[in-house]
A protein has these predicted regions:
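Alpha-helix C-terminal capping segments
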Residues: 52-61, 106, 267-272
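Conserved beta-alpha-beta core of the PfkB/ribokinase-like small-molecule kinase fold
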Residues: 141-211, 231-233
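Beta-strand->loop->alpha-helix junctions that form or flank phosphate-binding loops
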Residues: 39, 65-70, 88-99, 171-172, ...
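Short gly/ser/thr-rich secondary-structure transition/capping motifs
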Residues: 85, 122-127, 167-174
């Protein structure tokens, strides 16, 4: 009996790597207030790293392009990525800047607030991307975020577009983007806040989500997915519009759920599924 060939997705993730320092508390403090927290732990983090790890755990062949400082946080992160079977050949080291860190507070409902000190992430350059051209050329999908310089995102997008590669952009943190970048992006994955930044429309319900998706699509992107947390995701795939509800689970901590969604979506699309099928898969993975 002939065993069918299953394509192993090749994904290049270009983005940030941080060390997350997480404190759990019953509630989040208000400005000027000091409260006592509970447990404290450190994890590998940064949107790029989280998405790379998610894609690797779902079976993809992942290359991660990023930059760390020459310090303990950076070296520890590098070892973690290697243990996840991520190709770290193009994680560069900046001898002058520290590795990125994120300070995260999580309340009893699983909601969080985050402050990021980007460090070496902000020195990831177009010249660094050039060194990984061959990997980009070989990839099925290029997955990016906005925790690295916008100039680098624009350069990598143009290069991937030139090579005919699928580009998925998670436009976080929220920022205004030029239409040339958006036209070369195959799928964009904003949350409510990022969708409002891109569309000028506040997303409060299904109707406003539909209007925001239309406004973003008018900038030249056929495929738009607005992630709506526990409600699910509103999807535009070419001329189809659909609300896909999230899987119902007990929420412990929402930190990183959006990054798992992005990583899972990139894997599913690279395996040949439609966008709607991929969003359903990503919803389940991020639950």
């Amino acid at each position: 009996m002939e065993i069918p060939y299953i394509h192993k997705p090749k994904i290049v993730v270009i983005g940030s790597c941080n060390t997350d320092m997480v404190v759990k508390a019953n509630r989040l403090p208000v400005p000027g207030e000091t409260i006592l927290g509970g447990s404290f732990y450190m994890n590998p983090g940064g949107k790029g790293a989280n998405q790379a790890i998610a894609a690797a755990r779902l079976g993809a062949d992942v290359t991660f392009i990023s930059k760390i400082g020459y310090d303990l946080f950076g070296l520890q992160a590098l070892e973690i990525y290697k243990s996840e079977r991520i190709n770290t050949e193009f994680i560069f080291t900046d001898s002058k800047k520290p590795s990125g860190v994120a300070l995260i507070s999580v309340d009893s409902f699983g909601e969080n607030c985050i402050i990021v000190a980007s460090g070496a992430n902000q020195s990831l350059s177009p010249e660094d991307i050039d060194k990984a051209k061959d990997k980009i050329r070989e990839a099925d999908t290029i997955l990016m975020q906005l925790e690295i310089p916008l100039e680098t995102v624009e350069y990598a997008t143009a290069l991937a577009y030139e090579y005919g590669k699928r580009v998925i952009l998670n436009p976080a943190p929220a920022s205004s983007l030029n239409n040339e970048l958006l036209k070369k992006t195959n799928v964009i994955l904003p949350n409510r806040i990022e969708a409002e930044m891109l569309s000028g429309i506040k997303v409060t319900n299904l109707k406003s989500a539909h209007r925001a998706v239309q406004a973003i699509s008018c900038k030249g992107i056929e495929n738009v997915v607005i992630t709506l947390g526990k409600e699910g995701a509103f999807v535009k795939e070419k001329d189809k519009y659909i609300m896909i509800p999230a899987k119902e689970v007990d929420t412990i901590d929402t930190t990183g759920a959006g990054d798992v969604f992005s990583g899972a979506l990139s894997v599913s699309l690279s395996e040949g599924r439609s966008l709607i099928e991929a969003v359903e898969f990503a919803n389940a993975a991020a639950a």
